[in-house]
Amino acid sequence: MFAIIKTGGKQIKVEAGMEIFIEKLEGELNTEVTFEEVLMVDGKFGSPLVQGAKVTGTIVKQGKGKKIRVVRYHPKKNVNKVYGHRQPYTKVKIEKIEA
């Protein structure tokens, strides 16, 4: 059984036992999280959400992604600025899908 959930502005296909990387969620390690914005469960589409469906998971890790370099450059103006950014993420293990 699989489902498509909406979290962090993205749609993610999940199955029980999967570990997914999503946008940062507030919470400590080993805390249970529930996703109630379920768009599809086992072939049944919602409009826009499936009524009564929810996906439950556990927070496994809080971390930051790889560093990216952002450059601000203006030619002939002697302006050259380099910024760094690391996007925070949460790793969640999907425990069960309820339809």
UniProtKB/Swiss-Prot annotation:
Belongs to the bacterial ribosomal protein bL21 family. Part of the 50S ribosomal subunit. Contacts protein L20. This protein binds to 23S rRNA in the presence of protein L20. GO terms for biological process: translation. It comes from Mesoplasma florum (strain ATCC 33453 / NBRC 100688 / NCTC 11704 / L1). This is Large ribosomal subunit protein bL21. It holds the Pfam family Ribosomal_L21p. Disulfide bonds: none annotated. One of its GO terms (cellular component) is ribonucleoprotein complex. Keywords: Ribonucleoprotein, Ribosomal protein, RNA-binding, rRNA-binding. GO terms for molecular function: rRNA binding; structural constituent of ribosome. PANTHER family: 50S RIBOSOMAL PROTEIN L21, LARGE RIBOSOMAL SUBUNIT PROTEIN BL21M.
